[in-house]
């Protein structure tokens, strides 16, 4: 359910792209969240407490969680499904954070991947999950980070323990199996060579292999237009046609939307499967100062609302959405 890639261009033109694959309407809107906001982890006893040090533009899931976004320092997060995720027990140590706030915690507190990894390694979070709205099953996600330097990290919770893969080489993430197994599968396909044959199904392991080959094979540039277009083309290649879903395999679902982050330009692109246009947000045009209003760009049912080009001025004041807490 989703594919994420990082393009390492020339002259630090580093660009992250992802698809959001989900079998039903996910109720996404874009939000601009300022600095200086006090938050808690909303996960019961010992919940983390912090004040946002960085403003961010995010895409929500159901308007109760941060599923994707980038902060004003150029740090991006992408949350993707991972069925194998097992989060710490309620009795485990560490500051507690609801899964809905996990990505926002990173965007609020850190400027770089290295900074986030250092903090999360020193003090692992006790991430707590809840049911997906209307699904009757627990949400299970892993988190990817990337920054303006091209650095990346993948954070997973396996058997209740935090596992972090940190390095520029971790440019691709999809879904099952766990990241270490994805890397092993990709090594096998490297021996065959992508120009000879690539696996073509919608399964997560196949999307991982295709995305890994193409994000490495495409030409590298510092041209912001070409870089963004290139990343969109790779993400589209790993997308799932609209209307395709496999009920017994939630890892295979229709692509609902795609995002691309130009870390150098601080530009956040959004493309809905049900809208004819790609549009973008210029983070440098948004007031993230403490006390600035929370802003929302309404995408409508099925993200069908049509925007084109720079949609930064389309954001409107709104009451902050409530993150889904875990009792």
Please state what every model-predicted region is:
Residues 25-30, 87-91, 164-168, 279-285:
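A short, polar/proline- and glycine-enriched secondary-structure boundary/capping micro-motif
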Residues 22-24, 83-85, 160-162, 274-278:
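Short, surface-exposed beta-strand-loop junctions and turns on beta-sheet-rich folds
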Residues 1-15, 128-140, 148-150, 170-327:
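C-terminus-biased signal that marks the final domain/tail of proteins
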Residues 75, 80, 84, 89-100, ...:
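Acidic/His-rich structured neighborhood in mature extracellular/periplasmic domains
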Residues 96-130, 224-234:
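Proteins synthesized as precursors that undergo proteolytic processing into mature forms
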Residues 17, 79, 155-156, 269-271:
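Beta-strand residues in well-ordered beta-sheet regions across diverse protein folds
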Residues 1-94, 122, 127, 131, ...:
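A contiguous strand-loop segment
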């Amino acid at each position: 359910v989703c594919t994420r890639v990082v393009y390492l261009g020339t002259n630090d033109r580093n660009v992250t792209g992802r698809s959001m694959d989900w079998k039903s309407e996910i109720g996404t809107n874009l939000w601009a969240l300022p600095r200086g906001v006090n938050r808690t982890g909303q996960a019961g006893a010992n919940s983390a407490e912090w004040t946002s040090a960085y403003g961010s533009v995010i895409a929500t899931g159901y308007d109760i969680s941060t599923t994707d976004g980038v902060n004003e320092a150029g740090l991006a997060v992408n949350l993707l499904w991972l069925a194998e995720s097992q989060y710490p027990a309620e009795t485990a140590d560490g500051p507690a954070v609801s899964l809905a706030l996990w990505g926002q915690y990173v965007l609020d507190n850190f400027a770089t991947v290295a900074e986030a990894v250092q903090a999360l390694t020193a003090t692992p979070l006790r991430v707590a999950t809840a049911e997906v709205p209307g699904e009757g099953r627990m949400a299970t996600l892993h988190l990817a980070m990337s920054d303006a330097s091209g650095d990346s990290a993948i954070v997973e919770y396996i058997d209740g323990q935090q596992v972090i893969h940190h390095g520029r080489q971790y440019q691709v993430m999809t879904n099952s199996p766990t990241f270490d197994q994805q890397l092993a599968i990709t090594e096998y396909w490297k021996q065959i060579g992508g120009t000879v044959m690539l696996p073509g199904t919608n399964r997560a392991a196949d999307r991982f292999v295709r995305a890994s080959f193409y994000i490495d094979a495409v030409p590298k540039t510092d041209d912001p237009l070409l870089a963004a277009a290139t990343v969109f083309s790779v993400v589209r290649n790993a997308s799932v046609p609209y209307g395709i879903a496999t009920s017994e395999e939630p890892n295979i679902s229709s692509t609902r939307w795609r995002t691309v982050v130009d870390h150098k330009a601080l530009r956040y692109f959004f493309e809905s499967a049900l809208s004819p246009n790609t549009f973008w947000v210029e983070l440098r045009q948004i007031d993230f100062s403490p006390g600035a209003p929370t802003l929302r760009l309404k995408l409508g049912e099925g993200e069908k609302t049509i925007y084109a080009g720079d949609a930064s001025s389309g954001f409107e004041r709104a009451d902050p959405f409530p993150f889904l807490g875990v009792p």
